[in-house]
């Protein structure tokens, strides 16, 4: 997907993207590739691949599930790495107020430089483990209308890291590749215990390649019990509802 094809794909979905926004994506790509030479940010570095598998993939919540995004919404991105999915969404939908939490300081340093270069406002970067970031005494707990994750962790693990951060009546949106059926089956108990309810598992295909993608949307129905999230490392080693 070339930058021009990226622009057309967004226009086909009803998003008119300005020259300034396209320039922001071009700068993002340049900085990602340059920094990646000495900080491991991504295995994907070819321009066409980055525009499809990072930039387009990251904005799919806005394209495929726009009903969950209102102007000025507070969004938290857990384990964003090189800024995915939240910063491409911020470029496309500038009114979002974005908080990114990541456990690796090198990535946060890159993101600080990137946010400055892109002249993005209302972006907060936090170096922390998700388990402590959302703990019972954290100021960030149950603060966000939307929490996203595009991580490789299973849904049962991601739910424990993300749902505690969601306000009641807010949404946790997980960006997943194919085969979510088993993950949803394994994660059902965790979602319920943490105060969530599965709303939809929306499947769609990426343009150009037709690769399958899913958006799993969970609504926060009640407060998360204080004992969650458990201490760092525990959710991954011993997921809620593990058989």
Swiss-Prot record:
GO terms for molecular function: rRNA (guanine-N7-)-methyltransferase activity. Pfam families: GidB. InterPro entries: rRNA_ssu_MeTfrase_G (IPR003682), SAM-dependent_MTases_sf (IPR029063). One of its GO terms (cellular component) is cytosol. S-adenosyl-L-methionine binds at residues 79, 84, 130-131, 150. It comes from the Bacteria. Keywords: Cytoplasm, Methyltransferase, rRNA processing, S-adenosyl-L-methionine, Transferase. It is an enzyme of class 2 (transferase). Residues 219-243 are annotated as: Disordered. Specifically methylates the N7 position of a guanine in 16S rRNA. Belongs to the methyltransferase superfamily. RNA methyltransferase RsmG family. This is Ribosomal RNA small subunit methyltransferase G. It comes from Pediococcus pentosaceus (strain ATCC 25745 / CCUG 21536 / LMG 10740 / 183-1w).
């Amino acid at each position: 997907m070339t930058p021009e094809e990226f622009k057309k794909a967004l226009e086909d979905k009803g998003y008119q993207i300005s020259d300034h926004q396209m320039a922001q994506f071009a700068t993002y790509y340049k900085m990602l590739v340059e920094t990646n030479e000495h900080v491991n940010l991504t295995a994907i570095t070819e321009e066409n691949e980055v525009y499809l598998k990072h930039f387009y993939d990251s904005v799919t919540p806005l394209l495929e599930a726009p009903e969950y995004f209102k102007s000025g919404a507070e969004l938290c991105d857990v384990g964003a790495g090189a800024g995915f999915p939240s910063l491409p969404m911020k470029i496309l939908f500038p009114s979002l107020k974005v908080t990114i939490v990541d456990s690796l300081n090198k990535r946060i340093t890159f993101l600080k430089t990137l946010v400055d270069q892109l002249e993005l406002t209302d972006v907060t970067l936090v170096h922390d483990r998700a388990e402590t970031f959302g703990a019972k005494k954290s100021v960030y707990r149950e603060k966000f209308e939307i929490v996203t994750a595009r991580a490789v962790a299973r849904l049962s693990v991601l739910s424990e890291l993300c749902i505690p951060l969601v306000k009641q009546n807010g949404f946790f949106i997980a960006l997943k590749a194919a085969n979510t059926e088993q993950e949803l089956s394994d994660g059902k108990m965790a979602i319920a215990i943490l105060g969530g309810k599965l709303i939809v598992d929306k499947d769609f295909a990426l343009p150009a390649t037709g690769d399958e993608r899913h958006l799993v949307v969970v609504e926060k129905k009640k407060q998360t019990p204080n004992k969650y999230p458990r201490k760092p490392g525990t959710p991954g080693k011993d997921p809620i509802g593990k058989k």
